[in-house]
């Protein structure tokens, strides 16, 4: 039985390494618990990309500060149940858990129930994506497919395609339009 557990752990570790995704849990970054949660279906057809339009962070410590500030704003000022996004990606190349898997976000009106929301920390009208961020985002999307959160033929949108906004910023917009699942 112990051998089976070790094999399972090794498989999970290798799967994470193959996808190149390290997800920093909400508890690890000091996030608050959601006041409520709505389940999100599996095999969704869409992923929506955002930017937070705030400060850029390039270290784990700085990204944690940004995450805590964004969550406080979303919960305390906007009255939302939690941080709006399912996942966020810092300039340090880490993926940070927001609402996480299988929980409906509050990131794109009329699209929350049919998409996952992924946001980059920073303002990408002025900031530029690093190769680590691009790798993390693509790895996270691959992970979402392998987990059954989104279908393999999912459609990738920038927030501006589903709402009246500049989000996800010009620099992210120009990048994601080159990705295979992006649709005009």
Swiss-Prot record:
It comes from the Eukaryota. This is Peptidoglycan-recognition protein SC2. N-acetylmuramyl-L-alanine amidase involved in innate immunity by degrading bacterial peptidoglycans (PGN). Probably plays a scavenger role by digesting biologically active PGN into biologically inactive fragments. Has no direct bacteriolytic activity. Changing residue 171 to H: In strain: ZW141. The record marks 85 as: Important for catalytic activity. One of its GO terms (cellular component) is extracellular region. Residues 1-20 form the signal peptide. Its cofactor is Zn(2+).
């Amino acid at each position: 039985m112990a051998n089976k557990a070790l094999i399972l752990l090794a498989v999970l570790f290798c799967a994470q390494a193959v996808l190149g995704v390290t997800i920093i849990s909400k508890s690890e970054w000091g996030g608050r618990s959601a006041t409520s949660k709505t389940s999100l279906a599996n095999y969704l057809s869409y992923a929506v990309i955002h930017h937070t339009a705030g400060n850029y962070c390039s270290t784990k410590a700085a990204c944690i500060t940004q995450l805590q500030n964004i969550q406080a704003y979303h919960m305390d000022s906007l009255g939302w149940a939690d941080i709006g996004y399912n996942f966020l990606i810092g300039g340090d190349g880490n993926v940070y858990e927001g609402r996480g898997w299988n929980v409906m976000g509050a990131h794109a009106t009329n699209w929350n129930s049919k998409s996952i929301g992924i946001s980059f920390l920073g303002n990408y009208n002025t900031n530029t994506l690093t190769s680590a961020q691009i790798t993390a985002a693509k790895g996270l999307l691959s992970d979402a497919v392998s987990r059954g959160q989104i279908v393999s033929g999912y459609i990738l949108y920038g927030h501006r395609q589903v709402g009246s906004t500049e989000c996800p910023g010009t620099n992210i917009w120009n990048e994601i339009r080159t990705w295979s699942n992006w649709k005009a």
